[in-house]
């Protein structure tokens, strides 16, 4: 005996609940597929790319600006490298260079003044104190705030600020000759307290550095601060003097054969070393590890180096023909550079193409990947609809 129920032809097929549910599920799927471009997850480079300028209240773009796309070739690489070199190789002001003419005394310095064969002057200099602090002045003659120093048997203050110890020695000897026969005087600095420079940023030991008889050059200041930290961007060093900031590209100076030790610092100068993380390049899209990539220690970064830091292109989802570099130029006008990395030879261009601060490197996905992602969104809805239709059949 046949256990199946006979097919009821009295009810039109399109009025049966199970059929209606199944059709509804397929209708939803078809509508979603028709709008696949709008619901596809992830990003995709439009053709042609455009930047929204104005939008309406409901979010629709009312006007846009077409962004030019330039193909990366050897001529373009050479052009960009020349432009960047002209910027990074900007001359350092001549005022920063110089030679040391010897230490010049200043207010706060402590002098040790010895008059030979006259021990009575030793008491005037004072005796060392026990349990002294590092900030305490050493025993001796302190140069006053007006730049003068007092010494026994000399009726007038000796002008010391702006002079070398040997010049002060000669002046004291000349005055003491009025009282003693052929006095022999020695003047040395017991404590350097007149001037400091300040080093901050990406050095191992930021802080103030006292200027002494060793010329305070840029290199000396960095070395006293423990040297550049691994995070330092040696292309972005700034000297601030009297309210004016002077950028110094230390890496470029060395490449050009200019010794940074010829840059002389003055009392009150601020030396700041920028961090590499302050000027990153953003790598996103179909790469294995999307990341914010800092430049190298010399401030440079190429396209191939950035992709390498991001784990290279994702071989399953990336379209190697669609690698883009998005950049905002000096006039705030955006530009997009395109490189086809399908051929390994194009890696030579990527290895030479220089990136700039805040560039965005974007690797597009393939059309199949976009379709697959849309289907992955729709399959759960379709399956649920079909299951519901079968259950209620």
What role is predicted for each listed range?
Residues 24-35:
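Bacterial N-terminal signal peptides
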Residues 292-393:
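C-terminal soluble interaction/assembly domains
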Residues 118-133, 162, 278-285, 368-377:
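Short, Lys/Arg- and Gly-enriched loop/turn segments at beta-strand edges
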Residues 70-72, 80-83, 179-180, 229-269, ...:
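Positively charged
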Residues 144-155, 193-206, 275-292:
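Eukaryote-biased recognition of intrinsically disordered, low-complexity regulatory segments
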Residues 109-117, 146, 164-180, 199, ...:
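Amphipathic, non-transmembrane alpha-helical segments in extracytoplasmic/periplasmic proteins
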Residues 2-7, 12-13, 37-174, 245, ...:
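N-terminal, post-cleavage mature segments of outer-membrane
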């Amino acid at each position: 005996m046949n256990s199946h129920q006979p097919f009821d032809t009295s009810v039109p097929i399109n009025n049966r609940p199970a059929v209606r549910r199944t059709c509804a599920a397929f209708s939803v799927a078809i509508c979603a597929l028709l709008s696949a471009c709008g619901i596809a997850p992830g990003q995709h480079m439009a053709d042609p790319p455009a930047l929204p300028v104005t939008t309406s209240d409901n979010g629709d773009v009312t006007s846009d600006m077409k962004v030019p796309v330039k193909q990366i070739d050897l001529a373009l690489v050479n052009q960009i490298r020349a432009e960047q070199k002209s910027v990074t190789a900007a001359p350092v002001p001549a005022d920063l260079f110089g030679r040391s003419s010897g230490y010049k005394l200043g207010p706060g310095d402590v002098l040790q003044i010895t008059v030979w064969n006259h021990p009575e002057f030793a008491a005037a200099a004072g005796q060392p104190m026990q349990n002294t602090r590092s900030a305490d002045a050493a025993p001796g003659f302190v140069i006053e705030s007006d730049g003068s120093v007092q010494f026994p048997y000399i009726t007038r203050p000796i002008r010391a600020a702006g002079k070398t110890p040997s010049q002060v020695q000669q002046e004291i000897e000349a005055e003491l000759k009025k009282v003693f026969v052929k006095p022999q005087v020695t003047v040395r600095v017991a404590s350097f307290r007149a001037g400091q420079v300040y080093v901050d940023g990406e050095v191992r030991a930021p802080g103030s550095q006292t200027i002494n008889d060793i010329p305070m050059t840029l290199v000396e200041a960095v070395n006293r601060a423990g040297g550049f930290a691994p995070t330092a961007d040696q292309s972005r060093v700034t000297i601030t003097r009297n309210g004016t900031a002077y950028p110094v590209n230390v890496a470029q100076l060395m490449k050009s054969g200019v010794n940074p030790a010829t840059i002389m610092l003055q009392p009150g100068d601020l030396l700041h070393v920028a961090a590499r993380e302050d000027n990153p390049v953003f790598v996103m899209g179909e790469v294995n590890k999307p990341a914010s990539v800092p430049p190298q220690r010399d401030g440079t970064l190429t396209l191939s180096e950035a992709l390498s830091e991001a784990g290279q292109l994702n071989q399953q989802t990336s379209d190697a023909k669609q690698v883009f570099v998005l950049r905002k130029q000096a006039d705030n006008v955006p530009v997009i550079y395109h490189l086809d990395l399908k051929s390994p030879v194009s890696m030579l261009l990527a290895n030479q193409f220089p990136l700039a601060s805040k560039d965005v490197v974007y690797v597009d996905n393939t059309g199949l990947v976009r379709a697959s992602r849309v289907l992955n969104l729709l399959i759960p809805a379709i399956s649920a609809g079909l299951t519901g239709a079968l259950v209620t059949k």
